């Protein structure tokens, strides 16, 4: 990771609230994200492929940065499609435009650097050097070696589609005071969805198919579940209790 984004983690360790983040979304970081995206074959909702965007990359990114600085850049509504699930049902999937993927990709990297020092050890999903196998191992170790008699397995139904925007922004504002950076997060949250030619407003939930959605989900659950359990539940207990979370499964 280059272009200064790697410095955010150190800043986040020392400062409880970060004031300037939007400047990390610049030509260099967008170009770096574009190179990451080139290996994928997916086409954005606007029909633009990576190779098409790459053919005039300097002008395209210069124009994108200019629009972001003047706040004339607005994310497009994602196109909703459906993919089959293992149980035979269909899972909705959102396809964003290519430029939106670039901006979201950079903003997601920034958010991950902000929050990685702040997330608790009980969280395993969508985090650097953490995975489901580690979560399973941790659960196994707790059952085998700690004073655990009961296991409660929970899955938050429809979590990603029902995240409360107002509370999510409050959580972000607790750690980030860069209004311009937060403004673009709100725009992504409110960008809407196109299905069968009809625009559906986004009143709740994280962007479908968005690169920024996993870290936003982790921020939300960090406050409403992880921190709540650690700071408010554990001190009231006489025995032992542990939380192991992978995304919305815990």
Predicted regions and their residues:
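Non-catalytic, polymerase-adjacent accessory regions of viral genome-replication enzymes
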Residues: 1-62
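Short alpha-helical scaffolding segments that buttress acidic/His motifs in well-ordered protein cores
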Residues: 33-37, 106, 184-189
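Residues immediately flanking
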Residues: 45, 98, 109, 154-156
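Conserved polymerase palm-domain catalytic core
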Residues: 67-68, 72-82, 86, 118-122, ...
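Conserved phosphate-binding loops in nucleotide/dinucleotide-binding enzymes
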Residues: 92-97
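Duplex nucleic acid-engaging cores and interfaces of nucleic-acid transaction enzymes
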Residues: 99, 103-106, 132, 150
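Solvent-exposed aromatic/hydrophobic patches embedded in short alpha-helical segments
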Residues: 102-107, 111, 216, 220
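Electropositive, glycine- and tryptophan-enriched low-complexity nucleic-acid-binding patches
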Residues: 105, 109-124
